[in-house]
Amino acid sequence: MAADVLSDRLKTVRLTGAAFFEIAAEAPWAVASPPREMILPRILPGADHLIAYHAVTAGRCVANVAGSPPIELQAGEVIVFTHGDPHVMSSSPGMRADPPTTDVLDVAAAAQVPFLINYGSADAISAKLVCGYLACDARLARMLLAGLP
């Protein structure tokens, strides 16, 4: 029964845009996802609501969100930030990274998809991720995502 309610709600949410990129990283590494107010106008202009996601395709990593315990992820796992909150993906818990500058976001927006980000040597990659942002109507997103963290 609950699956039917979720299916009905998912049918009402229309994605209005998407952007994605790949990360190949050698430990130690850390990359910050900036606030949605910085991302939306550059990567998904005109979008109302931002959902960020990271799918670990190889190795391990950690998702760090201010005020929350780190979440360890391994290959095959996905983490979704339903409200597009700023966060840091890294090789170890508690690592920090400066958010990308607006110039970097502009380059990413103009780049061919997927945009590839390399940290370190290709011979010593400890993690690979497919990351991205989904845009949808804010009103419908609130209805669907209201009960999620």
Which residues are covered by each model-predicted region?
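Generic protein-terminus/edge-of-domain signal
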Residues: M1-E72, E77, V88-G120
